[in-house]
Amino acid sequence: MKTLTGLLLVGLLALWIGLPSTSSKILFGCGISPGNPFPCSLPGLTGNRCRRDYDCPQTLRCCNFRCSRSCRIPPVLPWSCPRNPFKCTIPGIDRCRYDYDCPGRQRCCYYSCSRICK
């Protein structure tokens, strides 16, 4: 049993050593967008205002910016979701959660009180 535990710990250590460090990277997690002009050496130090896009209102996205995550306006690209003209008080039924839930090159967009593939 001790041998198995030791091998498991050595294996995990080997995987951890092989992973790239995120502290030296410039973080900006809003899909394809310009890089974060503020490199962060201590990610998450200032506290996150969101964890995922669902935590943000309307069409804002949860992005890495400076040293924390916050709701930000995503860049408008030709294949981006259109702005949602509706202000919803009661959420609808989502038909997707992420872009990979949609067929082909469609995106999972928040539109008319729910998320749909467009």
Swiss-Prot record:
InterPro entries referenced in this protein's UniProt entry, alphabetically: Elafin-like_sf, WAP_dom
Domain WAP: 25-72, 74-118
UniProt protein name: Waprin-Enh1
Expression across tissues: Expressed by the venom gland.
Disulfide bonds: 30-63, 40-67, 50-62, 56-71, 81-109, 88-113, 96-108, 102-117
Predominant place of localization: secreted
Residues spanning the signal sequence: 1-24
A Pfam family this chain is assigned to: WAP
UniProt-annotated location(s): Secreted
GO molecular function, one term: peptidase inhibitor activity
Matching PROSITE patterns: WAP
GO biological process, one term: defense response to bacterium
A GO term from the CC aspect: extracellular region
Keywords: Antibiotic, Antimicrobial, Disulfide bond, Repeat, Secreted, Signal
Organism: Pseudoferania polylepis (Macleay's water snake)
Function in brief: Damages membranes of susceptible bacteria. Has no hemolytic activity. Not toxic to mice. Does not inhibit the proteinases elastase and cathepsin G.
Similarity comment: family membership: Belongs to the venom waprin family.
